[in-house]
């Protein structure tokens, strides 16, 4: 495996292998006062973000540093990108400096795949990891979500996962649909008609406009933020009406099955898609997702940079 650009590029065995590796990193770090492994000592990782990020960027940085790599953050707003430098020239510059991996978030779908072609022609050059490209893919988010579901519920096969909210603009949805259906889950997308993707009839999912008809027999309820920064029109009448129809209220949370877990890729809009109290409820796995994000990204970085046959510890 040279790059991680899309969940669709991974086989079922690839997915399970990365999840298992994430669990091994978590176990290796348990109880350590100093979270440091020599796994990627002497390696250089660049993070290149053209969009804002808290969880993904800091998680990748932490993952690299916990494996003793040198991690260098490049912000598009404070680099030569601001002067008009192209993505191609930025990527080639980082490659020439000596990058072993480039972790990139970009506002354009397909940008990570294009970068990989530029910096690693013929498979020679740094690995590229897609940290989110437009509304296309966010593969490490789907991997960490699967790791979290497996930790909470055991096997993913046969589980019902309901994803509620702005599915139209969400790269998380697309990656999770690819991954969860590959592992045998039933996936249901719920949202207003204006926030469900065109062509959804061809996806391996069911979809519904009625949240209450789907969530009460679900094993996982995953809430999504309304991505207002990607909207240029009226996708729903008011925030209050949206919260009434598609928000996870305290009343709805009480009616869920006892074992059902609530997830959210973040950032959360408390009071809109999720109630303030529900966001902090014991069944809500948001912070576990964040923790698993570090271990999952350690697994990805290790696999791509050191190689699948290398020893991690």
UniProtKB/Swiss-Prot annotation:
Heterododecamer (2C3:3R2) of six catalytic PyrB chains organized as two trimers (C3), and six regulatory PyrI chains organized as three dimers (R2). Catalyzes the condensation of carbamoyl phosphate and aspartate to form carbamoyl aspartate and inorganic phosphate, the committed step in the de novo pyrimidine nucleotide biosynthesis pathway. Belongs to the aspartate/ornithine carbamoyltransferase superfamily. ATCase family. GO terms for biological process: 'de novo' pyrimidine nucleobase biosynthetic process; 'de novo' UMP biosynthetic process; amino acid metabolic process. One of its GO terms (cellular component) is cytosol. HAMAP family: Asp_carb_tr. This is Aspartate carbamoyltransferase catalytic subunit. It comes from Corynebacterium diphtheriae (strain ATCC 700971 / NCTC 13129 / Biotype gravis). It holds the Pfam family OTCace. It is an enzyme of class 2 (transferase). Coiled coil: none annotated. Its EC number is 2.1.3.2. NCBIfam families: asp_carb_tr, PRK00856.1. Pathway: Pyrimidine metabolism; UMP biosynthesis via de novo pathway; (S)-dihydroorotate from bicarbonate: step 2/3. Carbamoyl phosphate binds at residues 55-56, 105, 138, 141, 266-267.
